[in-house]
C-alpha cells in the first residue's frame, strides 16, 4: 500500500481530505482474513469482521465522499484516454469504452444490489443515467438506507461496499492510464 501512496493521492485530494504520500507511513494490522483467488488480482473480495461494526454518520459521509472522488478520477481518466488502448502482452485487454461499460455495469447490476438498490445498467455513454446511479449508491452509503446488510444475506456492509466500489473504479482508471501510453 505504501508503494502506491502517490498513485492513490489524487483520490483524497479530490475528496478534500488531508493525505501526504511522502509521509512515513506505519500500518497497524487490525485483522487478518483469508484471501481467495480474486485476492491474487487485488480484489478486496472478503468482508472483514471489522466492517460489520456500526458506522457513525461522519465516517459514512467520509466514505461516500471518497467513493465519489474515485468516480471523479475514473471519469477524468476516461476523458483523457484514447478509445483504443494498448493491448497486453498476449494481445488482450478491453478498450476504453468496454472498460467503462464494465465498470458502470458492475456498479448497477453487481454492487448496487449488495447494498439494497435495484438499478438497471445504463449505456456506457449515458452520463445522465450514470450520474443518477452513482448518486443513489452514494446516498445509500451515506444514510445506511441499505440497512444492516451482511455477507450471510449476500449483502455488503457499508464499509466493505465503499472500499469495493471505490477500488473497482480506481483499478480500472489505473488500467486505462497504464495502457494509454505506448510501451
Residue ranges of predicted features:
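Short, charged, surface-exposed hinge/linker loops at domain edges
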Residues: 6-57
Amino acid at each position: 500500500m505504501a508503494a502506491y501512496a502517490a498513485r492513490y493521492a489524487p483520490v483524497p485530494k479530490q475528496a478534500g481530505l488531508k493525505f501526504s504520500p511522502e509521509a512515513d507511513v506505519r500500518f497497524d494490522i487490525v485483522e487478518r482474513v483469508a484471501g481467495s483467488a480474486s485476492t491474487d488480482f487485488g480484489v478486496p473480495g472478503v468482508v472483514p469482521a471489522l466492517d460489520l461494526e456500526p458506522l457513525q454518520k461522519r465516517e459514512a459521509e467520509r466514505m461516500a465522499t471518497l467513493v465519489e472522488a474515485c468516480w471523479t478520477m475514473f471519469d477524468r481518466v476516461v476523458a483523457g484516454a484514447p478509445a483504443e488502448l494498448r493491448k497486453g502482452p498476449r494481445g488482450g485487454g478491453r478498450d476504453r469504452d468496454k472498460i467503462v461499460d464494465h465498470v458502470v455495469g458492475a456498479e448497477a447490476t453487481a454492487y448496487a444490489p449488495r447494498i439494497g438498490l435495484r438499478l438497471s445498467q445504463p449505456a456506457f455513454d449515458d452520463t445522465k443515467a450514470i450520474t443518477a446511479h452513482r448518486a443513489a449508491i452514494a446516498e445509500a452509503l451515506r444514510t445506511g438506507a441499505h440497512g444492516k446488510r451482511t455477507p450471510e444475506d449476500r449483502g455488503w456492509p457499508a464499509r466493505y461496499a465503499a472500499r469495493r466500489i471505490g477500488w473497482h473504479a480506481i483499478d480500472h482508471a489505473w488500467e486505462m492510464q497504464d495502457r494509454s501510453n505506448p510501451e
